[in-house]
Amino acid sequence: MGSHSTGLEETLGVLPSWLFCKMLRFLKRPLVVTVDINLNLVALTGLGLLTRLWQLSYPRAVVFDEVYYGQYISFYMKRIFFLDDSGPPFGHMLLALGGWLGGFDGNFLWNRIGAEYSSNVPIWSLRLLPALAGALSVPMAYQIVLELHFSHGAAIGAALLMLIENALITQSRLMLLESILIFFNLLAVLSYLKFFNSQTHSPFSVHWWLWLLLTGVSCSCAVGIKYMGIFTYLLVLGIAAVHAWNLIGDQTLSNMRVLSHLLARIVALLVVPVFLYLLFFYVHLMLLYRSGPHDQIMSSAFQASLEGGLARITQGQPLEVAFGSQVTLKSVSGKPLPCWLHSHKNTYPMIYENGRGSSHQQQVTCYPFKDINNWWIVKDPGRHQLVVNNPPRPVRHGDIVQLVHGMTTRLLNTHDVAAPLSPHSQEVSCYIDYNISMPAQNLWKLDIVNRESNRDTWKTILSEVRFVHVNTSAILKLSGAHLPDWGFRQLEVVGEKLSPGYHESMVWNVEEHRYGKSHEQKERELELHSPTQLDISRNLSFMARFSELQWKMLTLKNEDLEHQYSSTPLEWLTLDTNIAYWLHPRTSAQIHLLGNIVIWTSASLATVVYTLLFFWYLLRRRRSICDLPEDAWSRWVLAGALCTGGWALNYLPFFLMERVLFLYHYLPALTFQILLLPIVLQHASDHLCRSQLQRNVFSALVVAWYSSACHVSNMLRPLTYGDTSLSPGELRALRWKDSWDILIRK
């Protein structure tokens, strides 16, 4: 034990002297820190921040679509559920993050464009993230052109065009999503190029993995902001697929190495984006747990998962529907309006407006509001009782039931009489015995559409059911047509015989449910008026809520097909349209989404020139005439695939869309054209100008062209920032096209 102690003491005694000697040798050498700073990048970043952050809080008023995004931010602040069909929730959450960082409490009435912001609205913070995204897009354009192996001059040219383009400046200075979408589009392209360029010298290195994963993350973020982001995602996937195909044919790589490359790309470019996309919705639904104004669009099960609203009404209802249950039946379709199966004492007219006759039976409709007349009693046809047995007898798939209207005690009926507005379908009514030769036909077979087995029980909220008429095989269906005044403009319900296949308009679910106990009608009416009071919670899984929300977002159609400032894709190319975003309430200061016409026209021309040159070179190479060296040709093809392909994918799909379109939808496509423009100019200088004199003349023309673009940008500055009040004459002078709508006070 003593010898061990002595050895330890000797070691401790030597250690400090050893460290001391090391420190002396270290201090004798100069301490050198090498920092590699790209001053071009620093300067472009600074200029981008200056142009986007300058007087960012101005105007202190709601500008154009801020009226919509502001509402969504307020919903996030108050944790209220909402549905926006324009895109996934990631972009909205980023805007809400700005509000949260600024301490916004969500209390502001977003009711009109031009409304002055109150003092509690942190407008600088709310507009900060779009402005930062717009500013950082400038240096990213520079880096993308460099990664394509073009010159610093071409890279600076692309960045300067992004810097001075008026429409990009305007869109990034407001609480809007396009600048954030463009940022992630460019980040996805830049990350993939850096990954691709590191492929040859350092595959599977830390940097290689970093850029590959960042590509997938950026693509997912772009799609998560707006569905338009999927166009750039497809662009990256397409180019990555071509490169992967080339890897498969590389004989220098082993089979295991090729498999590793393919798996890495599948994980980073497919698995990671899908995971992140689901994560965006998970966070979105976790934040928005309270009932809100858009609940009615969702299913009863979804509504019941939200705090308040339907959850407050339906909490703890009996799960299994039994004979004698009192229920409300909601149409699963929700189109054209969410509504419930309904009846009232009024009857169908004897003769309709078109001269057809009716059965004069009690009307059955679908009513878009909660009402006492929405309640029905599920009756066993073999028994007279309208109460639930003890123990309850659950209704199962395939059972025959009768539906008794709770307030009038008449049974749901259909027969071979044409419906009032859908003559090819049967009329649905509640049967009144007029003592004539029209027997009751009130038996319905229960068909549980989402059953797991043929003995499934009918469940509250969860089961989606169809009612098949026993006598005629017609299916109870919401036609969606609005009845005339005699039907109080309620929605028509019919018996569908011609197309009995599955359709949401034929599917119903129980929303409110109680076990009936009252034998007398007056007591039963009081029971129908009273709320349910049981205490069992009901939850919906995340994947079920995600699937429903995603489906609603994709299928929900905005009824606004016209707008004062809507435009067509053809008008975007030539900048024949603009959007008046804001007008000062007292002066002529105004903000417009209006592009730099020199840049837009030149960018379109560059796309045409590139396409013609590409096919010219391709035809000549087919004849074994190589105008370009192999490395220059590879650069030319990759640049075109990214820039021209990015423009086409972000532009051409709009010709197929049946929705209201605006000029700002073109901005993502425009950024790809802007990247292509200096590439075409450098190519012309390097490969088309044969002599030094031609190059000098061409360079002078390029400088003059850049100067004209800067001059136009400066002339349009008052309409870009809206901080200058111009006279009517000055405003007319800025109306360079008759189609531009410049606001002039009279």
From Swiss-Prot:
Q: Where is the MIR domain?
A: 318-381, 392-449, 453-513
Q: Which GO terms describe its cellular component?
A: acrosomal vesicle; dolichyl-phosphate-mannose-protein mannosyltransferase complex; endoplasmic reticulum membrane; sarcoplasmic reticulum
Tell me the Gene Ontology biological-process terms attached to this UniProt entry.
extracellular matrix organization; protein O-linked mannosylation
| Membrane-spanning residues | 30-50, 90-110, 121-141, 144-164, 176-196, 228-248, 266-286, 597-617, 636-656, 660-680
Report the membrane topology from the UniProt record.
Answer: Multi-pass membrane protein
Q: Which phenotype arises from disrupting this gene?
A: Mice suffer of developmental arrest around 7.5 dpc and die between 7.5 dpc and 9.5 dpc. Defects are observed in the formation of Reichert's membrane that are probably due to abnormal glycosylation and maturation of dystroglycan and impaired recruitment of laminin.
The pathway it acts in is: Protein modification; protein glycosylation
Q: Which Gene Ontology molecular function entries are recorded, alphabetically?
A: dolichyl-phosphate-mannose-protein mannosyltransferase activity; mannosyltransferase activity
Q: What is its EC number?
A: 2.4.1.109
| Coiled-coil spans in chain | none
Q: Which residues are glycosylated?
A: 435, 471, 539
Please state what the protein is called. Protein O-mannosyl-transferase 1
Gene name as annotated? Pomt1
Function summary: Transfers mannosyl residues to the hydroxyl group of serine or threonine residues. Coexpression of both POMT1 and POMT2 is necessary for enzyme activity, expression of either POMT1 or POMT2 alone is insufficient. Essentially dedicated to O-mannosylation of alpha-DAG1 and few other proteins but not of cadherins and protocaherins.
The species this protein was found in: Mus musculus (Mouse)
InterPro entries with a match to the protein in the record:
GlyclTrfase_39-like, Glyco_trans_39/83, MIR_dom_sf, MIR_motif, PMT_4TMC
Where is this protein found? Answer: Endoplasmic reticulum membrane
- Source species, domain of life: Eukaryota
Q: Which reaction does it catalyse?
A: a di-trans,poly-cis-dolichyl beta-D-mannosyl phosphate + L-seryl-[protein] = 3-O-(alpha-D-mannosyl)-L-seryl-[protein] + a di-trans,poly-cis-dolichyl phosphate + H(+); a di-trans,poly-cis-dolichyl beta-D-mannosyl phosphate + L-threonyl-[protein] = 3-O-(alpha-D-mannosyl)-L-threonyl-[protein] + a di-trans,poly-cis-dolichyl phosphate + H(+)
Per the record, the similarity remark reads: Belongs to the glycosyltransferase 39 family.
Q: Which PANTHER family match?
A: DOLICHYL-PHOSPHATE-MANNOSE--PROTEIN MANNOSYLTRANSFERASE, PROTEIN O-MANNOSYL-TRANSFERASE 1
Q: Which UniProt keywords apply?
A: Endoplasmic reticulum, Glycoprotein, Glycosyltransferase, Membrane, Repeat, Transferase, Transmembrane, Transmembrane helix
